[in-house]
Swiss-Prot record:
Family: Belongs to the thymidylate kinase family.
Organism: Chlamydia trachomatis serovar D (strain ATCC VR-885 / DSM 19411 / UW-3/Cx)
Keywords carried by this UniProt record: ATP-binding, Kinase, Nucleotide biosynthesis, Nucleotide-binding, Transferase
EC number(s) per entry: 2.7.4.9
GO molecular function, one term: dTMP kinase activity
Protein's UniProt name: Thymidylate kinase
Classification via Gene3D superfamilies: P-loop containing nucleotide triphosphate hydrolases (3.40.50.300)
SUPFAM superfamilies, per the entry: P-loop containing nucleoside triphosphate hydrolases
Domain of life: Bacteria
PROSITE patterns hit by this protein: THYMIDYLATE_KINASE (PS01331)
Gene Ontology terms: cellular component: cytoplasm; cytosol
CDD domains: TMPK
Protein's GO biological process: dTDP biosynthetic process; dTTP biosynthetic process; dUDP biosynthetic process
Lineage: Bacteria, Pseudomonadati, Chlamydiota, Chlamydiia, Chlamydiales
């Protein structure tokens, strides 16, 4: 099973994934956790470039770097893990690119979606289920403000992050069978309980 966790800045994806992984391992599943950009040596190298506020990367170059990292990530890590029977949980995937670069970033939802869905062939490589940790932009940014160092996307203005939230919710509305929206203001364990019910329904 391939699970993706999406959400805006400060939604608590890292804590959610850690807690969800722990519960699934307790149920006897083999879990592989990963992230984007990252998840493989190429992805980790690209991550440093993409998140560095000092790097002046054009929007189209940024998009292509995300896609190159994802293509390698899918082939090198995700597909082999799934073929071996493991459950893969990824912190971000296609929809983050569609929202951050396509919708909020202005490159166009349809254009970016088409590129994402053909990054490893003619057919879209999609997760079995996507959990969207939904949080108001202001609340998420307040959480992030406690950190000492903010990456390029975390430093963007609140209007950008409001567009990110609206973009994710719009995608969730278009794909209700795949998307499950969780309230990121709830305690992490409460969200994990809800997620486990959805995962068990797919088994």
């Amino acid at each position: 099973m391939f699970i993706v966790v999406e959400g805006g800045e400060g939604a608590g994806k890292t804590q959610f994934i850690q807690a969800l992984s722990k519960r699934l391992i307790e149920e006897g599943r083999e879990i592989v956790t990963t992230r984007e950009p990252g998840g493989c040596s190429l992805g980790d190298s690209v991550r440093g470039l993409l998140l560095d506020p000092e790097q002046k990367i054009s929007p189209y170059a940024e998009l292509l770097l995300f896609l190159a990292a994802r293509a390698q990530h899918i082939q090198e890590k995700i597909i082999p893990a799934l073929k071996s029977g493991k459950t893969v949980i990824s912190d971000r995937f296609h929809d983050s690119t569609i929202v951050y670069q396509g919708i909020a970033g202005g490159l166009g939802e349809s254009f970016v979606t088409n590129l994402c869905y053909h990054v490893v062939g003619d057919k879209p490589f999609l997760p079995d289920i996507t959990f969207l940790l939904d949080i108001p932009a202001r609340e998420g940014l307040l959480r992030k403000a406690r950190q000492k160092h903010l990456d390029k996307f975390e430093q963007k203005p609140q209007i950008f992050h409001r567009s990110v939230r609206e973009g994710f919710l719009a995608l969730a509305e278009k794909a209700p069978d795949r998307y499950k929206v969780l309230d990121a203001l709830l305690p992490t364990e409460a969200s994990v309980d809800q997620a486990l019910l959805q995962i068990r329904a797919l088994i």
